[in-house]
């Protein structure tokens, strides 16, 4: 069976990021899995597959250096759902509470130089990966690691890497979303989250240790409280509910009992649906 050559993609130096600083062990596991199974689709909804000869040739054209440079300038990301509060979880997993509401980041493809076919292909490209890190409230200092006395433990816990979910938002507009519903912070304070979008080429993941950073964004400031001061969880947004209905893995909350009375059935209103 004939082999089809793929073009050699030269990534601009500005896109290359140090593996050990930007990609943590969660990212490594994601990339390894991608390389092993050669991702053909998104977890639930990716409909764009590059398994035929024509598809592979099309992908190679799209991932050429010049095209990727254009793509970089046309891929803004927006935080559709900002984190507001969290309860500090300390150094154990027994009573870990997630950042609320869960951040949702949307990738938008609006380049004037892209055809509709290219726009839809980029929107459904299955191998985007988004990495999350925690920064101080000014957004200028990486706060991922605790002070020396804590043996360099990470401040942010949970699933720090997100994969794309393509679906309709609460206005029935199609989009590509990254949902981070399993993030917790160990210590009280004011912080921001930083999201970095990276494009992976599974066919080259075993030989490349650097992949293009397309864009990044920081959230608004959110507050992490002690258990005593934590104001409680808020009800899930219409956006979160809409994505959940379509198969996105995201927790749905009814709201916290401090904000609304406990129901007659005795359940706390902040339990998952």
UniProtKB/Swiss-Prot annotation:
Sequence motif Nuclear localization signal, residues: 211-218
Listed GO biological process terms: sporulation resulting in formation of a cellular spore
Domain named Velvet: residues: 70-253
Disruption phenotype: Decreases expression of wetA and affects expression of abaA and brlA. Leads to loss of conidiation capacities and defects in conidial tolerance to high osmolarity or UV-B irradiation but no change in conidial sensitivity to H(2)O(2) or the fungicide carbendazim.
Stretches with biased composition (Low complexity): 66-75
Compositional bias annotation for Basic and acidic residues: 254-267
Induction note: Expression is positively regulated by wetA and brlA.
Cellular compartments annotated: Nucleus
Keywords noted in UniProt: Nucleus, Sporulation, Transcription, Transcription regulation
Main location: nucleus
Example of a GO cellular component annotation carried by this entry: nucleus
InterPro entries: Velvet (IPR021740), Velvet_dom (IPR037525), Velvet_dom_sf (IPR038491)
PROSITE patterns hit by this protein: VELVET
Stretches for region Disordered: 66-86, 254-273
Pfam families reported for this sequence: Velvet (PF11754)
Domain notes: The N-terminal velvet domain contains a NF-kappa-B-like fold and is involved in DNA-binding.
Described purpose of this protein according to its UniProt entry: Component of the velB-vosA heterodimeric complex that plays a dual role in activating genes associated with spore maturation and repressing certain development-associated genes. The complex binds DNA through the DNA-binding domain of vosA that recognizes an 11-nucleotide consensus sequence 5'-CTGGCCGCGGC-3' consisting of two motifs in the promoters of key developmental regulatory genes. Positively regulates the expression of wetA and represses abaA and brlA. Acts as a crucial regulator of both conidiation capacity and conidial quality.
Quaternary data: Forms a heterodimeric complex with velB; the formation of the velB-vosA complex is light-dependent.
Family in the record: Belongs to the velvet family. VosA subfamily.
Protein name in the entry: Spore development regulator vosA
Organism: Beauveria bassiana (strain ARSEF 2860) (White muscardine disease fungus)
């Amino acid at each position: 069976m004939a082999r089809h050559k793929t073009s050699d993609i030269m990534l601009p130096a500005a896109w290359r990021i140090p593996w050990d600083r930007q990609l943590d062990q969660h990212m490594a596991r994601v990339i390894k899995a991608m390389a092993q199974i050669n991702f053909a689709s998104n977890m639930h909804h990716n409909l764009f597959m590059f398994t035929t000869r024509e598809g592979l040739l099309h992908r190679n054209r799209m991932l050429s250096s010049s095209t990727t440079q254009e793509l970089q300038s046309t891929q803004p990301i927006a935080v559709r759902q900002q984190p507001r509060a969290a309860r500090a979880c300390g150094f154990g997993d027994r009573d870990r509470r997630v950042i609320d509401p869960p951040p949702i980041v949307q990738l938008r493809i609006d380049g004037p130089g892209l055809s509709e076919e290219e726009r839809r292909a980029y929107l459904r490209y299955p191998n985007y990966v988004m990495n999350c890190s925690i920064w101080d409230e000014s957004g200028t200092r990486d706060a991922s690691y605790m002070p020396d006395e804590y043996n360099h433990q990470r401040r942010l816990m949970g699933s720090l890497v997100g994969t794309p979910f393509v679906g309709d938002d609460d206005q029935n507009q199609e989009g590509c979303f990254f949902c981070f519903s399993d993030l917790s912070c160990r210590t009280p304070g004011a912080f921001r989250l930083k999201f970095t979008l990276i494009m992976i080429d599974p066919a080259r993941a075993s030989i490349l240790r650097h992949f293009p950073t397309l864009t990044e964004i920081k959230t608004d400031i959110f507050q992490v409280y002690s258990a005593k001061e934590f104001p409680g969880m808020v009800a899930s947004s219409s956006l979160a509910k809409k994505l959940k209905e379509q198969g996105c893995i995201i927790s749905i909350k009814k709201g916290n009992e401090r904000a609304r009375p406990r129901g007659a059935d005795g359940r706390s209103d902040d339990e998952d649906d």
